Amino acid sequence: MPHVDIKCFPRDLNDEQKTALAADIAEVIIRHFNSKDSSVSVALNQVQQEDWKAQVWDTEIGPKLDELIKKPGYSM
């Protein structure tokens, strides 16, 4: 049951763009995890730039740098 939780600065994506993004992400997950499409879920959470450090970096990125399989090219 892979679940992907995308956090990003706000983007003006329409429903078609969101659907395409989810399909692309799901395709990669299905290929690498040998999952079924019905098992994959994708969330898109838009976080204001001024809230990024408190809501994302301090809770999900910074404390878990050793666990990340793709590390960011920035620090806070």
Swiss-Prot record:
Top EC class, one word: isomerase
Highest taxon in the source lineage: Bacteria
Pfam families for this protein: Tautomerase
Active-site annotation: 2 (proton acceptor)
Keyword Cell cycle assigned: no
GO terms under cellular component: cytoplasm
Entries under NCBIfam families matching the protein: PRK01271.1
Record protein name field: Tautomerase PptA
